[in-house]
Amino acid sequence: MQLSTLTALSPLDGRYQDKVTPLRAIFSEFGLMKFRVAVEVRWLQKLASTADITEVPPFSTQANAFLDGIVANFNEADAARIKEIERTTNHDVKAVEYFLKEKIQNEVELVKVSEFIHFACTSEDINNLSHALMLSTARDEVILPEWQKLIDEITRLAEEYKTIPLLSRTHGQPASPSTVGKEMANVVYRLKRQFKQLQNAEILGKINGAVGNYNAHLSAYPNIDWHKFSEEFVTSLGIQWNPYTTQIEPHDYITEFFDAVVRFNTIIIDFDRDLWGYIALNHFKQRTIAGEIGSSTMPHKVNPIDFENSEGNLGLANAVMTHLGQKLPISRWQRDLTDSTVLRNLGVGLGYCLIAYASTRKGISKLEVNQPHLLEELNQNWEVLAEPIQTVMRRYGIEKPYEKLKELTRGKRVTEQAMREFIDKLDIPQEEKLRLQKLTPATYIGAAVELVEKLS
């Protein structure tokens, strides 16, 4: 059976492959090879730029350009060659080293120093930096831009619907009114916090040998400050340096990275469920799309499938990333290999994220507030004005204001007339009575509009 979108085992590479395309060049095996090649080449160039390593003299402009070209022009044929070499070596990182030696075999200047490719490195020196570059690239080029799109869409809802009143529900029961826009603004604020946390998350790397002590480095060049050398190299890649490790970078930062994504996703799940509920309550209508079918047997159905799809995929994403976050920081003694197979799934959780984010945005694009229904619902719940009335009563020293409103309203459907009559009987200044008489459930929205306007 030929591999295709129809025969792929994972829906990421099958049904949903077009939605995860931006991640394939980063987290596929091709992507991992590309970053490994880049790290190996930059390490060789770093060695050549160090005067104390006389065996690797400074490279000429032509030699550096050739090496830069290997990195910049890395393609699928190169990746296929690495896989071919690996069939002999049975070692993926060693295959990259041999591939690079092949690439430079006709470059006299570089052939002379070919044994300094992968010099003093353990495989994990190359791998951890490659993984760091993968996560950094995905964050900056894919995930944060996707997050910004979602934030922008929900911000648009907040601004568009900032004045449309909404009957709130706490514990599922009618509560003090808000506005549709303010409820969207709450979500935006939460998402922006997580955006900043991922944006500022540290991405760490190390290059310090088989157990983190520069043993091999010092055996060959005991007079070089390898601690400083390591820091310079790691930071030159745009990665923060971790000076204290075993054979592996301990992956704590990966847990922190995925925890931030999981928190963002959890907020979106909350948003998806709220929108699903608002649609069920008829607060929102969904624009229909010609040709779409909601049910195989019930022709009338327009289901909130986009929010459901998002919720489901975010659940998968969070499950994968939570496992990575819990497993990766644990490695026996100076290292075991349990992290290796898990790290090959770095992009899986993020792939499910992309599917979900696209679904949430699609669901948002179909939304249309059902304002007449919202106003009708508010008009049926005059009891929500018990809160402002009893609060004003407290101000003017009326005895047991809460209890009096409780007796009038608790568990009851109160009419406008009943509330007006109650206000008329209050022993409070006339201007306060008039102010309370003007209140309706639709106008009792506090500072909701102003809070939306302050969001930006």
Swiss-Prot record:
One of its GO terms (biological process) is 'de novo' AMP biosynthetic process. Pathway: Purine metabolism; AMP biosynthesis via de novo pathway; AMP from IMP: step 2/2; Purine metabolism; IMP biosynthesis via de novo pathway; 5-amino-1-(5-phospho-D-ribosyl)imidazole-4-carboxamide from 5-amino-1-(5-phospho-D-ribosyl)imidazole-4-carboxylate: step 2/2. Keywords: Lyase, Purine biosynthesis. The keyword Lyase applies. InterPro entries: Fumarase/histidase_N (IPR024083), Fumarate_lyase_CS (IPR020557), Fumarate_lyase_fam (IPR000362), Fumarate_lyase_N (IPR022761), L-Aspartase-like (IPR008948), Pur_lyase (IPR004769), PurB_bact (IPR047136), PurB_C (IPR013539). One of its GO terms (cellular component) is cytosol. The active site is at H171 (proton donor/acceptor), S295 (proton donor/acceptor). N(6)-(1,2-dicarboxyethyl)-AMP binds at residues 15-16, 90-92, 122-123, 247, 296, 301-303, 309, 335, 340-344. PANTHER family: ADENYLOSUCCINATE LYASE (PTHR43411:SF1). Catalyzes two reactions in de novo purine nucleotide biosynthesis. Catalyzes the breakdown of 5-aminoimidazole- (N-succinylocarboxamide) ribotide (SAICAR or 2-[5-amino-1-(5-phospho-beta-D-ribosyl)imidazole-4-carboxamido]succinate) to 5-aminoimidazole-4-carboxamide ribotide (AICAR or 5-amino-1-(5-phospho-beta-D-ribosyl)imidazole-4-carboxamide) and fumarate, and of adenylosuccinate (ADS or N(6)-(1,2-dicarboxyethyl)-AMP) to adenosine monophosphate (AMP) and fumarate. Belongs to the lyase 1 family. Adenylosuccinate lyase subfamily. This is Adenylosuccinate lyase. The gene is purB.
